[in-house]
């Protein structure tokens, strides 16, 4: 009898920096949407975004590791650091499936990214060969009746925290400790 695959969510992002919104969302998806684990894939570059204020790759990875160290269902990953750039999602997913055949991967994206999904490189191939889970974002509405069979709309709480807000608040010297995991906050104070 074949052992069932580990259901693993792929939560890719800049995590510039990781904050409590990322963590609460991932926690909710693990506990309420059937995922066994979530891997935080720290992205070195998003082909659809200008990254003029992107923090160092290794610092962002370190912050993710600090933030998730106390939750066994989360893993920090630098998998995309080792792929050619720009790293397109289809290449990442295909490489993950090849490297980890005992896992069933689900790509986790926000509703804002879902609306841009037709512009993604090889979007149709992603939908044909991979699972996608969409989480809600403020001011972006998705009609679940229009989604392809490989796509699931997760019913998660809306959390309006952004890494841009975090970076701006830190630059202004504001005390925003409750928006960040305590270990991340302490590391950034240094």
Curated annotation (Swiss-Prot):
The gene is nadD. Pathway: Cofactor biosynthesis; NAD(+) biosynthesis; deamido-NAD(+) from nicotinate D-ribonucleotide: step 1/1. HAMAP family: NaMN_adenylyltr. One of its GO terms (biological process) is NAD biosynthetic process. This is Probable nicotinate-nucleotide adenylyltransferase. It comes from Phocaeicola vulgatus (strain ATCC 8482 / DSM 1447 / JCM 5826 / CCUG 4940 / NBRC 14291 / NCTC 11154) (Bacteroides vulgatus). Catalyzes the reversible adenylation of nicotinate mononucleotide (NaMN) to nicotinic acid adenine dinucleotide (NaAD). Its EC number is 2.7.7.18. It catalyses: nicotinate beta-D-ribonucleotide + ATP + H(+) = deamido-NAD(+) + diphosphate. GO terms for molecular function: ATP binding; nicotinate-nucleotide adenylyltransferase activity. Keywords: ATP-binding, NAD, Nucleotide-binding, Nucleotidyltransferase, Pyridine nucleotide biosynthesis, Transferase. Pfam families: CTP_transf_like. Belongs to the NadD family. CDD domains: NMNAT. The keyword tRNA processing does not apply. The keyword NAD applies. It comes from the Bacteria.
């Amino acid at each position: 009898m074949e052992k069932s695959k580990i259901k693993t969510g792929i939560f890719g992002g800049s995590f510039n920096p990781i904050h409590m919104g990322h963590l609460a969302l991932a926690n909710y998806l693990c506990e309420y949407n059937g995922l066994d684990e979530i891997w935080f894939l720290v992205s070195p570059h998003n082909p659809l975004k200008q990254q003029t204020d992107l923090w160092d790759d290794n610092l962002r990875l370190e912050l993710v590791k600090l933030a998730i160290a106390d939750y066994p269902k989360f893993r920090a990953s630098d998998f995309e650091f080792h792929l050619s750039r720009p790293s397109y999602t289809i290449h990442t997913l295909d490489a993950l499936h090849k490297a980890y055949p005992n896992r069933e991967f689900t790509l986790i994206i926000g509703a804002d990214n879902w609306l841009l999904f037709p512009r993604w490189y090889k979007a149709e191939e992603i939908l044909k060969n991979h699972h996608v889970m969409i989480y809600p974002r403020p001011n972006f509405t998705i009609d679940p009746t229009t989604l392809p069979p490989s796509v699931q709309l997760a019913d998660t709480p809306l959390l309006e925290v952004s890494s841009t807000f975090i970076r701006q608040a830190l630059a202004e010297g504001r005390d925003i400790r409750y928006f960040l995991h305590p270990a991340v906050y302490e590391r950034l104070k240094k």
